């Protein structure tokens, strides 16, 4: 019996849903002080860098038919894989809570029924998506994405309707910091993408489509957020929707975009949990993560996510850099045979520290790219030195 696989189109839909996100729109509002021209340039450069890494990460999982965190074991060993799986579950629980919080806050700003009510509604819809399952979402996802696409076109028409764009509004953010904030969003998906590309009929093509679709749509959301902040003078999503006169249409954008994006976070948290605890059922774990996210969203305020994004970058940028070096350049999978690959662990620590140090330096292309390049070079040189000694 043939195992059910996802098509290129289905993978594109999944990542369209990931890109249409309140988190992207909200992050885009931070770019307003740069002005439209510089802001768009920073968004595009950052997404090109981030989505190239996203593609390479997805190819590794697609070719090996392994989940994202299982592929990590090829470079870091069994215990190393468990370590990153644990960190990934933590960041995904965080993302789930943040997304539900943002969605509920924005929905409540449009239709005042209580934030906690919207937390429950959005959480219940995410659980429904999980129960249906990634390989059975085809028609439902097509309808949801079509509706979402139309609604975001309406939002774009309202935001850009007069054809005018604004100039710089201040110097609150450097260009390099803006690029890094643009890289950070696709980078946050690095530990997830293989969970979906491993299910694809044509993994490399599906990964390419996933990265391109996500990159284009995410850029679109960033630009909407940036120009909405300029257009309305607001950085609050609900106020932007209300001032734009979107009403119920805005509410639907908020709810559906939150569900389709957060589903990916919760689902991948479940898959990663299987790497930490082998007896856990991924689907049930994903439901538990959603419930925890709902509770967190109800109890805790989560208004600024920039530090959270940078923390994700500092953890996962050097991790994927080592994986890229091992899989594509060194062609090695030796770490599967060991409990912990100490050398790659040390190189990751160096990459992590380097990322945090580079955050204090204003680099036009952001700090992710130089951090990853240096980490890859260190990884290659270290392996070459070992071979020479042998």
Where are the language model's segments positioned?
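Membrane-interface "cap" regions at the ends of multi-pass membrane proteins
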Residues: 1-38, 136, 174-179, 191, ...
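Transmembrane alpha-helical segments of multi-pass small-molecule transport proteins
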Residues: 14-18, 84-89, 110-132, 145-156, ...
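Membrane-water interface regions at transmembrane-helix termini and the short interhelical loops
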Residues: 29-33, 59, 102-110, 123-144, ...
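Extracellular loop-to-transmembrane helix junctions
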Residues: 29-59, 80, 214, 370, ...
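Juxtamembrane transmembrane-helix boundary signature
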Residues: 44-76, 83-89, 383-388
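Hydrophobic transmembrane alpha-helices that form the core helical bundles
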Residues: 80-113, 259-275
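Membrane-interface loop-to-helix entry segments
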Residues: 117-159, 169-170, 207-214, 309-321, ...
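C-terminal membrane-solvent junction of multi-pass transporters and transport-like membrane proteins
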Residues: 170, 321-390
């Amino acid at each position: 019996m043939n195992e059910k696989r996802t098509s290129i189109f289905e993978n594109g839909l999944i990542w369209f849903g990931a890109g249409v996100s309140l988190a992207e729109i909200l992050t885009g509002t931070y770019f307003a002080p740069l002005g439209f021209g510089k802001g768009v340039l920073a968004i595009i450069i950052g997404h090109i860098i981030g989505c190239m890494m996203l593609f390479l990460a997805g190819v590794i999982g697609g070719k090996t038919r392994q989940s994202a965190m299982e592929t990590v074991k090829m470079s870091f060993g069994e215990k190393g894989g468990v370590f990153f799986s644990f960190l990934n579950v933590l960041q995904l629980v965080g993302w789930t809570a943040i997304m539900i919080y943002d969605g509920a806050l924005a929905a409540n700003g449009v239709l005042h029924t209580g934030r906690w009510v919207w937390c429950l509604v959005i959480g219940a819809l995410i659980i429904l998506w999980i129960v249906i399952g990634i390989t059975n979402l085809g028609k439902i996802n097509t309808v949801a994405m079509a509706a979402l696409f139309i609604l975001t076109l309406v939002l774009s028409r309202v935001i850009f309707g007069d054809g005018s764009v604004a100039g710089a509004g201040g110097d609150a953010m450097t260009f390099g910091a803006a690029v890094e904030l643009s890289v950070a969003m696709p980078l946050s998906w690095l530990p997830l993408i293989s969970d979906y590309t491993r299910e694809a009929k044509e993994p490399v093509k599906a990964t390419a489509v996933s990265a391109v679709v996500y990159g284009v749509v995410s850029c679109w959301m960033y630009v909407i957020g940036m120009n909405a902040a300029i257009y309305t003078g607001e950085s609050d999503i609900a106020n932007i929707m209300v001032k734009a006169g979107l009403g119920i249409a805005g509410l639907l954008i908020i709810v559906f975009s939150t569900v389709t994006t957060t589903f990916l976070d919760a689902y991948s948290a479940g898959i990663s949990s299987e790497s930490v605890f082998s007896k856990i059922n991924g689907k049930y774990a994903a439901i538990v993560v959603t419930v925890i996210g709902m509770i967190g969203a109800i109890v805790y305020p989560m208004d600024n996510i920039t530090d959270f994004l940078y923390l994700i970058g500092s953890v996962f940028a050097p991790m994927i850099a080592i994986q890229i070096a091992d899989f594509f350049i060194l062609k090695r999978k030796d770490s599967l045979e060991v409990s912990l690959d100490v050398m790659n662990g040390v190189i990751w620590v160096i990459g992590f520290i380097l990322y945090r140090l580079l955050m204090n330096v204003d680099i036009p292309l952001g700090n992710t790219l130089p951090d990853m390049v240096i980490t890859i070079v260190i990884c290659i040189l270290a392996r070459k030195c070992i071979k020479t000694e042998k």
